[in-house]
Design a protein with these regions (language model features):
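Hydrophobic, proline/glycine-rich low-complexity stretches
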Residues: 2-40
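Short hydrophobic/aromatic-enriched beta-strand-loop microsegments
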Residues: 26, 124-129, 266-270
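Core nucleotidyl-transferase/polymerase catalytic module
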Residues: 45-47, 60, 74-75, 96, ...
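Phosphate- and divalent-cation-binding pockets in alpha/beta enzyme and binding domains
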Residues: 56-58, 114-116, 255
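Contiguous mid-protein beta-loop-alpha structural module that forms a pocket-lining wall or clamp
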Residues: 80-151
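Intrinsically disordered, low-complexity, positively biased terminal segments
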Residues: 2-3, 10, 14-15, 48, ...
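A short helix-loop-beta-strand connector motif used in the catalytic cores of GNAT acetyltransferases and
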Residues: 29, 34-55, 62, 72, ...
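Long, hydrophobic/aromatic-enriched structural stretches that serve as scaffold segments
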Residues: 56-59, 64, 69-86
């Protein structure tokens, strides 16, 4: 019988992991392999039976010098022939062991939430995926001071982002800003960031996340300007769903729900945000879109 083992993924292994996400219908971003790996090069695991890879999981650590490190488990997929067997449980437990000293977050699918509760995770709220065709959205007429986020000092963006994520994540943000298939915007007021968001090209359409804003008008302005950029990228495309936009909101933010409804976006999917320790003290009223189901 082939020996089961788990190894840390290398950069070249990320194509296998992203491939599993794509096969599972998760619609990963075109540059998710590079961006995810940059977040924590020790945080991606591949399960093997002998020489054969059979599944993957991420256990990404976000160090925090002022508090308990935050960790996030995602990308948890076993290939179909090995689902429902002990190997998936071993892989999940290994990920939790790597983050044993962290407050761990997950986005659990509905059918697995009871299972995750058995491992000590408690539900905080639902995250809701909404999807819409941005080709019909209005243009932003706000006149607000919106700039390309790449022009800002990374430290300034990290400081703003850290208000809405449980730990600073400079490596993630630096990678998230870089690809040409990503577009990040920040809304400025008196030299300070009061909103920012990123759109990234995916296998089908675009995902927007994060989208953090101090009020709904700022969130709407960023969202509409990101949509305008998407329309520019897709105006000559005949690919199905080229102008589809996905935004993952929290049920905690009623204004985010109102925003997607005004744009006629449709609910398509949900997860439960769960934590292994206390729920982080985040202002979800300012979180109009989470970054990703895979990394938090």
């Amino acid at each position: 019988m082939s020996a089961f083992h788990i190894r840390t993924a290398q950069a070249h292994d990320m194509d296998y992991i992203i491939g599993l996400l794509a096969e599972a219908g998760w619609n990963p971003g075109l540059h998710d392999a590079q961006c995810f790996f940059a977040s924590d090069p020790q945080g991606f695991l591949i399960a093997h039976l002998g020489e054969q890879a059979i599944g993957c999981v991420s256990a990404v650590r976000y160090p925090d010098v002022s508090a308990t490190d935050f960790g996030f488990i995602g990308c948890y997929i076993m290939q179909p022939p090995w689902r429902g067997q002990i190997y998936g449980a071993w892989l999940g437990m290994h990920a939790m062991k790597l983050l044993h000293d962290c407050n761990i977050g997950i986005d659990g699918v509905v059918e697995q939430q009871t299972h995750y509760a058995h491992f000590g995770f408690s539900m905080a709220h639902r995250n809701l995926r909404y999807m819409g065709d941005c080709s019909t959205w209005p243009t932003d007429q706000s006149g607000l001071d919106i700039v390309n986020a790449r022009t800002l000092p990374l430290a300034q963006l990290v400081a703003f982002d850290s208000q809405y994520f449980p730990a600073p994540r400079p490596a993630f943000l630096q990678a998230w800003l870089s690809p040409d298939t990503h577009h990040s915007l920040a809304l400025m007021q008196d030299g300070q960031i009061i909103a920012y968001g990123t759109a990234r090209a995916c296998i089908r359409g675009y995902k927007i996340g994060p989208l953090f804003a101090q009020d709904s008008n700022s969130a709407r302005a960023i969202l509409l300007q990101l949509a305008a950029w998407i329309r520019q990228q897709t105006q000559t495309s005949s690919a199905p769903g080229a102008s589809e936009v996905m935004l993952d909101i929290s049920e905690e933010n009623a204004q985010a729900l109102a925003l997607v409804q005004r744009l006629d976006m449709q609910f398509v999917f949900e997860t439960a945000r769960m934590y292994s320790q206390a729920r982080p003290a985040l202002n979800w009223q300012h979180i109009y879109g989470i970054s990703s189901f895979e990394l938090g």
